[in-house]
Amino acid sequence: FRSMQGSWLTVNYDPWGIGVTYSGYLLLGVSMLWMLVSRGGEFRRLLRHPLLKKGGMFVLLLLCLGSGVHAQKRSLPALARKQADSLARKQVIYNDRVVPFNTLARDFVLKLTGKPSYGGMTPEQVIGGWLLRPEVWQNEPMIYIKNEALRRLLHLETPYACLADLFDGEKYRLQKFWKGKQDHHQKMTSLEKAIVEADEKVGLILMLQNGTLIRPLPEDGSVEPVSDTKIQAELLYNRIPFSKLLFMFNLTVGMLAFFRLLYRGLRRSSALSDSSGRIVALSFSSRLADTFFPFSLYAAFLFQLFGYGLRWYIGGRIPLGNGYETMQFMALCALFLACLFRRRFPFMVPFGFLLSGFALLVSYLGQMNPQITPLMPVLVSPWLSTHVSLIMMSYALFAFMMLNGILALCLRRSARMLMLLSRLLLYPAVFFLGAGIFLGAVWANASWGRYWAWDPKEVWALITFMVYGAAFHARSLRIFRRPLFFHIYMIVAFLTVLMTYFGVNYILGGMHSYANA
C-alpha cells in the first residue's frame, strides 16, 4: 500500500452480546408500537384533541412554469436525425448493465457540457459527430469548466473549452497543473477537484475515440439483451426531466400556498385592513383554486411516483442506493404524507409541496449521481430498502415539523394547535427513525459482522434520535409544554437531521459516505 499503513482485518464473535442487543431492539420496538395503539396513551389522546379536528385553510389560483432552452446552431458534422433516432434504441453495455445507446450518448453529452443535448442536436448526433469527424469536434468549445481558477490557468474567456485547448502540441496541459498527492486520503482543493473533473471529461472523449467507451453486446450470446419494453421505458425516462419539472412546479405552488396560508392567519388576527383583504381574497379565494390545490397535489404525487417507478423498473432494484435516489424517495414520501393528511390538516399541503420541491432541487443541483447503476454487493440486501425507507420517512416527518414550527412563529394565535400537530407527528417520526436504526444495525451485522461501529452516520443518527426523543418528556420537562419553545426546539432540532444526511456525506465521510456516489 502506498500509505504503508497496511490493513486491519477483524473477526467478531459475540453471540451473547448480539442476542441481548437484538432483544433490546425488539422490546423497544414493541414499546414504541404500544405507545401508538394504546387507548390511554398520549398519541391517541392527541388524535382526539378538538383543536386538531378543526378544518384548515388556504387556496390559490395559478402558477407559471417555464424552462429555457438554449440552442446553439452551428454547422457541425453530425449524424442525420433519422439515423441518430434509429441508433438510440441499439443496446450496449454501459455501467455494467445493458442500456439503450441513448443512455450512453446522453451521459456523454451531459458529462461534457452539463446539458443533455448540445447545439440543437440529439446526444446520438453529437457522439456520432465525434466518431465521424473528430478533427472538427476537437475544436468545438463544449467541455464545461466551472472553476474560474482553472479557466484562468487555461486562458479561457468563456466557461467552455475545446479539446484542443487542453493540449499544447502533444503535451497535455492539465498534467503540469496537477501535483499528485502522496496521501490519497488528503483532501483536494477546489482547483485540484476541477482539474480531476476536466481530466475525466478528456478521458471520456479519448475512450470514445479509441473504441473502449461503446461496448456492443457480444455475438456469442453471453450477455442477454433486455426487453423492448424496458428499452422503451428507459428512453422515456431519459426524455422527461422529472426532477427539473417537478421541483419547479412544487416550489412555485408551495410558495404561493404558503403565502396564502400566512395571509389567512394574518387576516384572522386583523393584521390586514379590510380593503386589502378584499383585493387579495378576489385573487385567491375562488372555487377554482379550491379544486386546483388538491388536484395539483395528487398530480405531483402521481408524476413523482411514475418517475420513481420507471427508475425502479429500469434498474431492476429499489432506487435507494445513493444520495440522488434517497432524495427522490424523500420527495415521494413528502407528497404521500401531504395527500394522506390533506383533508384533516389542509395546511400540510404547502408543506408537502415545499419539502418535496426542495428535496428534488437538492437532487437536481447537488453533487448527486443520477445515473442508474447496479448496487455494490453489500447493498444488495432486503434490509437496505426497509432501513432507508424508514429513515427517509422519519426525515420527511421531521421536516414537516420544522416547517410547522416556522409557520407557528408567524401565526402566534395558531401556535398551540400547531404544537399539538407537531407532537402528534413526533411519535411516528421518532419511531420510524428508531426502527430504521435497529434494522440498519441488523443489516450491518449481517454485512460486516458488527451492529455498531461508531461510524459518523450512526453516531449522528443516534444524536438525532435522542434530541427528538427529549421532546416526549413534556411531563417531566415542563418547558416543552410552551408552544413557542417547542416550535423553536423543533426548528433547531432539524439541524441534526441535516447534519446526519448532508454533513456526514460531504464533510465527515465514513462508511456511509458512499450514499452520494
Language model segments and positions:
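Solvent-exposed, non-transmembrane regions of integral membrane proteins
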Residues: 1-283, 287-517
